[in-house]
């Protein structure tokens, strides 16, 4: 019997993206009686909702009453998948286009082993389909996260383990979600997929790349004040919730130096107010109450040591859209050297 799949599309002002995305989904080869499509609209101000209602009556639509952010919007879909006994949930960004067999290929990989909790499709750049957007994402030991293989030439790849899957195109096993939980709703947006991938590995689930499952992404790298705040804040949350205490102490010196560097960076870019808001967030007692509560849940479910987890982490930030001489010749060598030293100490 085929596996029942819910394809979840979080949508916000998606009029420019949804026609291509939904049209490509209408051509997929997976049995039509084995999947459903759910669009969760996060209070769009364009005519996205009307477009779906008028053109895609077969698609289930949930419209939020207020803007909840990427993490909670996806969680609405994931909880729907759990409540309605789906075997899988596939998270798909609205700015994507899929190959007809993308779902068949992803499920074929996932079904090989019950310990596979997530499978990412090969994500290619829509406007330059000869280049990769992501073939599995990387985690820097200080919480930075970036797309693996970005801008590399598209080539034949083998199925392999990856550190964490891009939330733009990932198949999640509902059984695994019932164990590790959904996205952390406190994240709002950014790093929620980093955190989930980390927690999957901690709970002894595997995260794999399905190279023959292909999705195209209308990706544009952006720098913004809002993005800076959430990415800085959430990388701290990921570290504080998932590392063991001893590991946090070991990375503390490097984290302090990085904090100083990030403050100067924020000052130069004019985003220093956002950096101060991050500091303010961590001075609030309720913040630490949430962190400790989440941390207890994560550590209670832990089956894998930090010694094993950190083998997947990197000491350099290698992402072409943010490369500069300071990062390449100063920051990366220093922080990578520190990482190579301390990871040999971590035995727990």
For the regions a language model picked out, list residue spans one by one.
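Short, acidic, metal-binding catalytic loop of nucleotide-sugar glycosyltransferases
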Residues: 23-34
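A conserved acidic beta->alpha catalytic loop
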Residues: 24, 41-50, 66
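Glycine-rich, basic loop-to-helix element that forms the pyrophosphate-binding segment
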Residues: 64-84
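Short beta-strand-to-loop acidic/aromatic patch adjacent to the donor-nucleotide binding site
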Residues: 86-97
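Conserved donor NDP-sugar-binding/catalytic core segment of glycosyltransferases
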Residues: 96-139
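A recurrent flexible, glycine/aromatic-enriched loop bordering the glycosyltransferase active site
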Residues: 132, 141-146, 152-172, 189, ...
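A short, conserved alpha-helix in the catalytic core of glycosyltransferases
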Residues: 163-214
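Active-site-adjacent helix/loop segment of glycosyltransferases
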Residues: 207-320, 324, 328, 332
